[in-house]
Amino acid sequence: MDFGFTEEQQAAVEAARAVFSSVAPDAVPSPSLTPGPVAPDFDRPLWRRLAETDLLSLVIDPEYGGAGLDPVALCLVLREAGRVLARVPLLETCAAALAVQTYGNGELRSRLLPAVGRGETVLTVAASGRTGHEPAELAVTARESNGTWLLDGVQTAVPWAQQADHILVPAHTAADRTVIAVLPRVLEGVSLADQVSTNGERYAELRCDAVRIPAADMVTTTGAWEWLRDLLATGNCALALGLASQVTAMTSEYTSKREQFGHPIATFQAVAVQAADRYIDTRAMEVTLWQAAWRLSIGTPGPLPITADVSVAKIWASDGMRRVVQTAQHLHGGFGADTDYALHRYHAWAKTLELSLGPAAAHEERLGGLLAAHSPG
């Protein structure tokens, strides 16, 4: 088994680290210090730097001005973004662009992808459904009529919706098919109601009331939504890995310097064992992430559907990240809750990611169903 990355993927990591080195996590707006949203907009200067270093066009094909790399490369960059709590819609924009590129029509690709790569167009995805506990594709209905589509329904917790130029909205048809509408944010029948996430970022409830969409702005290919949903989940696992890795490093540094009874507390067995267990969590998160990202990249069938590998990655990301952050707070003591220190920000972002990923028990149940359905003989 080869866990190495290609030269192009390693170059993407180096570029991402250079860009994200300018982000100070302890300066990220804190939900503990700000009532309501922590900021009206995402980090636009950082977004411009990502565009200037071609990281926004990383997965876009060369014919549209991009590098043409794969989901593994995207996840490598997202891991670096998670380390510093980067306040940019990098996952949503790149995942949506890759879905349009893979499943959209030529006119839609030509209109959106070059602008996305230049940082001029921001995309997001409505992936939480009506309540956050139901399939997103069931929250909105789509009906074709005279060459256009009519959308009705509600999606909650749409990240970066107020700043996005287009929102990709999954919807179900009367024929029990799932389609994706590439919805302009400003359009008759579209309304956004402000919501605030656990980390203080602006989310929105999206309401579609007889919204009319031209056929050219619809992605109707079978399997497109399922693929995009898995890519978003894998990207969130990459963000979780970056966050957990950084928190583990912070804990290691703190416990190595904090002394009690004349010795660094890292030398005490109770502390060392807890820290070691959390390191094992991050390693498991890493291995399962790259398995899922690799399956998405190659796209070839395996003994189980790609969704199974994504479910395993989500199980470890959701539970592992939570354990890492909770142990970090415990080992830091009162210092971990100090708002002048970055750890409480990581805790808030971890909770947001955990809620986005969903509970591990649900993924375990889904994985069990897949194993039963695909068991040999």
What residues fall within each predicted segment?
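N-terminal glycine-rich flavin-associated loop
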Residues: 87-107
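Glycine-rich phosphate/cofactor-binding loops in nucleotide/flavin-utilizing enzymes
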Residues: 2, 13, 334-377
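A structural signal for short hydrophobic beta-strand segments in well-ordered beta-sheet cores
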Residues: 140-143
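A short, Trp-centered hydrophobic/proline-enriched beta-strand micro-motif
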Residues: 118-130
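C-terminal helix-coil-helix/basic helical segment that borders enzyme active sites and/or dimer interfaces
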Residues: 24-38, 252, 256, 260-263, ...
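Amphipathic, small/basic residue-rich leader segments at the start of a protein or domain
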Residues: 1-87, 369-377
